[in-house]
């Protein structure tokens, strides 16, 4: 237990404060500090990874331990409902790979439609987000750094928010960059929104343009703004 917990208005709504032992200190912007000098994404082609250019890529680059059964079922249902689509996950370990593929087969999905992204240098990791059509967030433990990595590369990420801190992180990041409409609040809404975007290329392209503007205009990737806000909080605490 600590004395203070840094938060923002989305991560911990006021009606949730009673569940925390610490005093909640609210930053005026997203609670997550981000550097502004991540490698610039370089445009890549799907064929670089042996993927046909017409294939729709759903992806999730979080740790495999974050993949709950409920959310994985949604992803498999998306594969069932979106022809010529694949699910691109981050390399984990052989046991996780086989368990996920086996579950998919039992669910009636060709396990070859689930592929794994090898560990690569950070520059390439950021750049390969440019070929992802839609990044699917995990629940109840959201993407954290992987969410900001995706947005830095201009990749839309669809999240589902719950009541806990860990389940609201991607929502906080999306709100900061001006993409509140990529936040959903239940499984049905999450699935419907993902399928809609997968079938509406024009809306998906507009989202990518909005993310590009948000990357430049929002405070999400402006560490000087974050530090100034944090220093103001420190000063306030020292004088009270």
Language model features with spans:
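Catalytic binding pocket for nucleotide-activated donors in carbohydrate/polymer assembly enzymes
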Residues: 129-130, 134, 138-221
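Short, conserved active-site loop motifs that form the nucleotide-linked donor/cofactor pocket
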Residues: 3, 24, 113-114, 180-181
């Amino acid at each position: 237990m600590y004395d203070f917990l840094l938060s923002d208005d989305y991560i911990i709504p006021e009606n949730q404060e009673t569940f925390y032992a610490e005093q909640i200190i609210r930053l005026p912007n997203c609670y997550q500090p981000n550097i502004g000098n991540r490698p610039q994404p370089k445009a890549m082609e799907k064929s670089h990874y042996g993927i046909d250019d017409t294939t729709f890529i759903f992806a999730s680059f979080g740790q495999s331990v974050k993949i709950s059964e409920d959310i994985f079922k949604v992803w498999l249902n998306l594969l069932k409902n979106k022809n010529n689509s694949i699910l691109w996950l981050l390399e984990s370990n052989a046991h996780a790979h086989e368990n996920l593929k086996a579950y998919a087969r039992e669910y009636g999905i060709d396990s070859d439609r689930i592929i794994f992204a090898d560990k690569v240098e950070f520059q390439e990791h950021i750049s390969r987000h440019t070929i992802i059509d839609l990044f699917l967030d995990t629940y109840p433990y959201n993407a954290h750094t992987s969410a900001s990595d995706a947005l830095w590369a201009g990749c839309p990420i669809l999240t589902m928010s719950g009541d806990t801190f860990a389940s609201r992180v991607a929502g906080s990041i999306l709100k900061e960059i001006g993409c509140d409409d990529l936040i959903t609040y239940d499984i049905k809404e999450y699935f419907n929104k993902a399928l809609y975007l997968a079938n509406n290329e024009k809306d998906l392209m507009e989202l990518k343009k909005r993310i590009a503007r948000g990357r430049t205009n929002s405070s999400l990737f402006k560490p000087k703004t974050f530090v100034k806000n944090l220093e103001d909080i420190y000063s306030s605490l020292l004088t009270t």
